[in-house]
From Swiss-Prot:
It comes from Drosophila mojavensis (Fruit fly). Residues 44-53, 60-72, 82-117, 157-166 have a biased composition (Acidic residues). Residues 1-11 have a biased composition (Basic residues). This is Ribosome biogenesis protein BOP1 homolog. Belongs to the WD repeat BOP1/ERB1 family. Required for maturation of ribosomal RNAs and formation of the large ribosomal subunit. Residues 1-167 are annotated as: Disordered. It comes from the Eukaryota.
Length: 792
């Protein structure tokens, strides 16, 4: 059963004018159209109650009637030409319905016909603006007056909904800049795009700023892109927050204090029970106990404290001290008669002040060094980092207080105290007397040439036996041959992979370069120098010897010999030795017929020895005793040096047995070099150390040198002069004097001479390789800055 409720509005037709409608009138027309559309389509969700009470414009004076059911849902409207006749007819119809009790079906049919007629006649015209005022008719049926919502109150304050805000854009809590590239800003409840409002230029903003009095209180809603006008309450709230006051003006900051719990301590008994009668009588049990004690005293069973102490002294007997006693006894007596007081703590210095002078504060370099010694705090100069505060009030609590108190207690409790005679020793007496560097010349002191041409890290460098040419390998997959005297690049050979190591054959009668690129070892004829020597080298590498020896499958799967392809033959490549794993290092024997390669990932086949004249290879080890880093041939004896991560093993190739194992006590070995006489070995490590081993003296280092600040990557001995050099990631090449005497009773003389630091650091890498000129006291270094530098 539906009831008809009417809201009637009288509309007067305005006088026609030739002026264009203003912006406010156009907005009213748009609102009227929305209102009429909402009334016309009752199926749509219309939640804006405000629009019903707004004035709308029409071209005729008509009355609107809204129909609603018992729940208040609007079903339609109807329009009559004359307001009074429509009201009377409506009243009569309602009276007849109530008195006669007609069927509900007839009423619903009449209502539907009237609503259809109203829909057909209530279409407004857009081209004629008009204004109207709403007036409710005095009829018998109840008329519902639509009260506009107070904008100062929340939208759902008086309703039973749980929503707290009017959400127009349903995209959720996401960054709105995601919609910067689109024409819409989100989607409404009907899944329709919300088109962005048109944006004006700076002139429009300037005109609005001048003409619009509410421009200063207009903000933009980021969710819908619409402009929102702040109310007076919002402005007042912003002002209170900006002035650091409580946002709610009704809140009283200084309300009278209500003392819910009293501050006065009231002492009251837990139980207020009157004392029992027996509490005033003497205790019977105590009386019996006292009587037993009196009986024990009379019988002599119980003794007083003085009698007990006298009996203890009689049992202990007299004390006698021995004249000749052990040291422990004397120390015990000394602690009794001549105690040593605990040492006092050191007084705080200027660095421990809360406002120390600037020279006591750490700079960036000192701070990094202090933090690096986290695992070794005993090496720090100060156990704390000096801090500066503006005032004593800003000084926080000392975090190490409890630990220092605990350590102090341990020192007092556990550390023995003794008086020792201090020895006055001159410090200069302990320093070994070293010769002056001027007396140890010649050695390189300045940078003479820079060889530029590579575009990536230069990994390795090697010099021709005569000292005229230089070969280098880089990560840019090229091998370059240089003329040392002029710095000119003579030839560039491109490879298919990164060049890890290059080595020039030490035999002056051959012109061969061994290049380790990827898993291939290339034997290249550089075609520089004597033409007869070049031809002899080509003839040697072109001949393929007859292999009468049958190789095992273990060797065949590890390495294969082959001649170079025609395109590689043009570059100078003659022989290709293909390995099953990437090659890291290649080294030659002193005679130039044997060369060894290292593959760290090869397990028990990491080290291979190749013979050039017979074109065959052999695997010297059947078991892997560590990750092999580098290998080396002895210059005189048939010995083979193998360096793993932590140790160095020396093998006799003739007897095929282990001769000696050198203990480095380091974390990771990076390289090694042997003295030309073969009795001393120099080892570089990644933990900033250089180790000098005397092979005739011991298996432990004769001297450990910590000359670099970062990892030491390469070391090299000079073939003629008593010099050796080291290169590190700290961009420095340190040249040192290392004299080895023929007298076995005299120790080697080691003197650091010069620090050459001209390389640039890139990606935490500095100097990657160093090598000496075979004749002159010149040293070459390669670095991560894609250059090769010559120091003379």
């Amino acid at each position: 059963m539906t009831k008809k409720r009417t809201v009637k509005r009288k509309v007067k037709e305005p006088e026609p004018t030739k002026e264009q409608p203003s912006v406010s009138e156009q907005s009213e027309n748009e609102e009227d159209e929305d209102l009429l559309q909402a009334v016309k389509d009752p199926g749509e969700d219309t939640t804006d109650d405000e629009g019903i009470d707004q004035e709308y414009q029409s071209d005729s004076s008509e009355d609107l009637e809204f129909e609603s059911d018992e729940e208040g849902n609007y079903l339609g409207r109807k329009v009559s030409n004359e307001a009074e006749e429509g009201e009377d007819d409506q009243d009569e119809d309602d009276d007849e319905d109530e008195d006669e009790g007609e069927d509900e079906d007839d009423d619903s049919d009449d209502d539907s016909e009237e609503s259809d007629a109203n829909e057909a006649s209530a279409t407004p015209k857009d081209d004629q603006p008009s204004s109207s005022k709403a007036a409710a008719a005095q009829t018998k049926e109840p008329i519902i007056q639509i009260i506009p919502r107070d904008p100062s109150k929340p939208e759902y304050e008086e309703s039973d909904t749980s929503d707290e805000e009017d959400i127009r854009n349903t995209v959720g809590n996401i960054p709105m800049h995601w919609y910067d590239e689109y024409k819409h800003i989100g989607y409404d409840w009907d899944a329709k795009k919300i088109i962005k409002p048109p944006k004006g230029d700076q002139i429009d903003d300037f005109l609005r700023k001048i003409e619009d009095p509410n421009f200063w209180r207009t903000v933009k809603d980021p969710m819908t892109g619409q402009e929102v006008l702040l109310t007076d309450e919002d402005i007042a709230l912003i002002k209170r927050v900006n002035s650091s006051r409580i946002p709610n003006p009704e809140h009283d900051e200084y309300a009278p204090w209500i003392e819910w719990f009293t501050s006065e301590v009231e002492k009251m008994p837990i139980k207020n029970v009157p004392d029992h009668k027996r509490s005033f009588l003497p205790s019977v049990s105590e009386k019996k106990k006292v009587s037993r004690m009196v009986h024990a005293l009379k019988m002599g069973w119980m003794k007083t404290t003085e009698e007990v102490e006298r009996e203890k002294q009689q049992k202990r007997g007299p004390k006698f001290y021995m004249l000749w006693e052990t040291d422990t006894g004397r120390e015990h007596m000394r602690r009794i008669h001549d105690p040593v007081s605990a040492p006092k703590r050191d007084l705080p210095g200027h660095a421990e002040s809360y406002n120390p002078p600037p020279e006591y504060l750490f700079d960036e370099k000192e701070t990094k060094e202090w933090l690096k010694l986290k695992d070794e705090p005993h090496k720090r100069k100060l156990h704390f980092m000096p801090q500066k505060y503006k005032s004593l009030r800003a000084v926080p609590a000392y975090s190490r207080y409890l630990r220092e108190r605990f350590l102090r207690c341990l020192d007092l409790y556990l550390c023995p105290r003794a008086k020792r005679v201090k020895l006055n020793i001159d410090a200069e007496y302990l320093i070994p007397k070293l010769p002056s560097p001027r007396d140890l010349q010649p050695f390189p002191t300045v940078e003479s040439l820079v060889y530029r041409g590579h575009t990536d890290l230069v990994r390795s460098v090697s010099v021709e036996p005569k000292g005229e040419y230089l070969v280098s390998g880089s990560d840019d997959k090229t091998v370059k041959i240089w003329e040392i005297a002029t710095g000119r690049c003579i030839r560039t050979i491109e490879t298919n992979d990164v060049v890890r190591c290059v080595a020039w054959c030490p035999n002056a009668k051959l012109s061969i370069i061994a290049v380790a690129t990827g898993s291939r070892l290339l034997l290249i004829n550089p075609k520089v120098g004597d033409k007869l020597l070049i031809k002899k080298t080509d003839d040697l590498l072109a001949e393929s010897p007859n292999l009468d020896i049958i190789e095992s499958e273990r060797i065949k799967t590890a390495v294969q010999w082959s001649n170079a392809e025609p395109d590689e033959q043009e570059k100078g490549v003659r022989v290709v030795i293909t390995h099953f794993k990437p090659i890291r290092q290649v080294t030659w024997h002193g005679r130039g017929d044997y060369l060894a390669t290292v593959m760290p990932e090869g397990a028990n086949r990491s080290a291979l020895i190749h013979q050039l004249s017979k074109r065959r290879s052999q695997i010297p080890f059947s078991k892997s005793k560590g990750l092999i880093q580098c290998v080396l041939f002895h210059p005189v004896k048939p010995c083979f040096f193998v360096a793993t991560q932590h140790n160095i093993r020396i093998y006799d190739l003739v007897k095929q047995e282990l001769i000696k194992k050198l203990l480095t006590n380091s974390k990771w070995i990076s390289g090694m070099s042997i003295h030309p006489k073969g009795d001393n070995l120099l080892v570089s490590t990644y933990d900033k150390k250089m180790l000098w081993f005397d092979l005739d003296l011991s298996t432990k280092p004769y001297q450990t040198m910590r000359l670099h600040r970062n990892a030491v990557r390469s070391v090299a001995f000079h073939l003629r002069y008593p010099l050796f050099a080291s290169g590190s990631d700290d961009q420095a090449v340190i040249v040192s004097h290392g004299m080895v005497y023929n007298d076995l009773l005299q120790n080697p003389l080691i003197v650091p001479l010069k620090k050459l630091q001209t390389h640039e650091k890139r990606d935490e890498f500095g100097v990657l390789d160093v090598t000496w000129h075979p004749v002159q006291p010149w040293v070459f270094s390669t670095g991560a800055d894609c250059t090769i530098r010559l120091y003379t």
